[in-house]
Amino acid sequence: MSSSSNLQYEEIPKKYIDPLAPKDKGEGSRVNGKDWKIKKDAFRVKTLGVVSKTKKDSFKQRELKRLEEEQYKARLKELKDEKESAKNQRIADLKRRREIKAEKERYERMATKMHAKKVERMRKREKRNKLLKER
């Protein structure tokens, strides 16, 4: 993209179009000696009007976009964690209820075989051992 690419034909300086147009004295003659050739600009020089995408978006806009993206991701993560914790809580409650039910059934089976007082003593002993083990 040269500096003259986005101009109308009439607006383009003659040095870019007409090879016979008078040269500026400051330019001097060409190194290769081909003075009859048309003057051309460098193909891609950023100072001549090629604007990259990063220059179009200002830093503040990119920063705002990045912050919004971070907030969105944080909120999404928070919702996922909340959902996961609710699921884990339900599972833990279900396990606890099943354990209590299984223990109750076990004591009932023991009660059919043994005397009631002996079952009560065993229950207390197991509870004591469980508390000691958890310490």
Swiss-Prot record:
Pfam families: Cgr1
Subcellular location: Nucleus, Nucleolus
Keywords: Coiled coil, Nucleus, Ribosome biogenesis, rRNA processing
Family: Belongs to the CGR1 family.
GO cellular component terms attached to this protein's record: nucleolus
Listed name of the protein: rRNA-processing protein CGR1
Keyword Coiled coil included in the entry's annotation: yes
Source organism per UniProt: Candida albicans (strain SC5314 / ATCC MYA-2876)
General function of this protein: Involved in nucleolar integrity and required for processing of the pre-rRNA for the 60S ribosome subunit.
Coiled-coil positions: 60-118
InterPro entries referenced in this protein's UniProt entry, alphabetically: Cgr1-like (IPR005579)
Amino-acid biosynthesis as UniProt keyword: no
Biased composition (Basic and acidic residues): 11-33
Region called Disordered, residue ranges: 1-33, 110-135
Basic residues bias: start-end ranges: 112-128
GO BP annotations listed: rRNA processing
